[in-house]
Amino acid sequence: MTNIRKTHPLLKIVNHSLIDLPAPSNISAWWNFGSLLGLCLMIQIFTGLFLAMHYTSDTTTAFSSVTHICRDVNYGWLIRYLHANGASMFFICLYMHVGRGIYYGSYTYLETWNIGIILLFAVMATAFMGYVLPWGQMSFWGATVITNLLSAIPYIGTTLVEWIWGGFSVDKATLTRFFAFHFILPFIIATLVLIHLLFLHETGSNNPTGIPSNSDKIPFHPYYTIKDTLGFLVAILLLLILVLFSPDLLGDPDNYTPANPLNTPPHIKPEWYFLFAYAILRSIPNKLGGVLALVLSILVLAFIPFLHMSKQRSMMFRPISQVLFWVLVADLLTLTWIGGQPVEHPFITIGQVASVLYFTTILILMPLASLIENKILKW
């Protein structure tokens, strides 16, 4: 008799996605981040659900409801810090996943790549709105500064900002709607993840060489289920170490002060995972230009497939491109550092140089390097 997993309409889908899926035999640990992102999403949805049971989205009680969660709810402190630091783990995995895609040429799967970019924007929007919910100083001023950027849009800007705020400033209406959006978006993300996987399974996974691996496939289970489980254990261990030993390491102390519209914090800055984009935004003295650069800092990923000039897919055998890739990584780390610094000399100049280098590397230097490598290999 045929196994039920191969005949049952629902189990059949699971079987083709997670059990009998033909996978390349040589995919490295860099391919673990996809499943880790799935784990992060599940952790965030479950911890978020339990937080939402005790949180109140009202300006007068939001801050104290978070305090109540940490002090009075059973293991509330654990749920809260798992959720806050889970977001950091989410972004670490996201950036590693995108970096892997760039390095090994996974962006040539256009549909999968484009859904991935939409997912990145959706996760960033969710994280931003989540940061506003505790209604601390950095929550309030972060929301004010970032939403205010939309006023740079010609003609409709001011109206748009007031429409998003639900008034003439960030207030009760803003907090309530941000909570509603923050709650619904992860489920939209989960749906997009399924579409992401649907498109991926149309082509099958890429591998480190970038060479088609149809002649050498192995079943996903048990090989990659075991490998992913190891990844899960390592990730959970690292997250628990962070949560249980230094839960506030990545947070901002200003967010332990309740929101006060009359008192601006000396340095308004977002969470660490947005600092690179924030640095790019600040490096342009014009408001609209800054907003465009901010959006383009992520949207530039959509141009990468069309700038792929190399005859090879992966960077595995392309030393010049490899050097440029790691220059890009170093540049992003520099931007992250600059984003957390005050707007003064020499940080302004460093930020501007790093911003120019970021776009130049992706849009000009990498395609040029590919052409040079083709020439060297007489292709």
From Swiss-Prot:
Residue spans crossing the bilayer: 33-53, 77-98, 113-133, 178-198, 226-246, 288-308, 320-340, 347-367
Residues that, per the record, bind heme b b566: 97, 196
Miscellaneous remark of the record: Heme 1 (or BL or b562) is low-potential and absorbs at about 562 nm, and heme 2 (or BH or b566) is high-potential and absorbs at about 566 nm.
Recorded topology in the membrane: Multi-pass membrane protein
Entry's family note: Belongs to the cytochrome b family.
Pfam families noted in UniProt: Cytochrom_B_C (PF00032), Cytochrome_B (PF00033)
Gene from which the chain derives: MT-CYB
Full protein name: Cytochrome b
Organism: Oryctolagus cuniculus
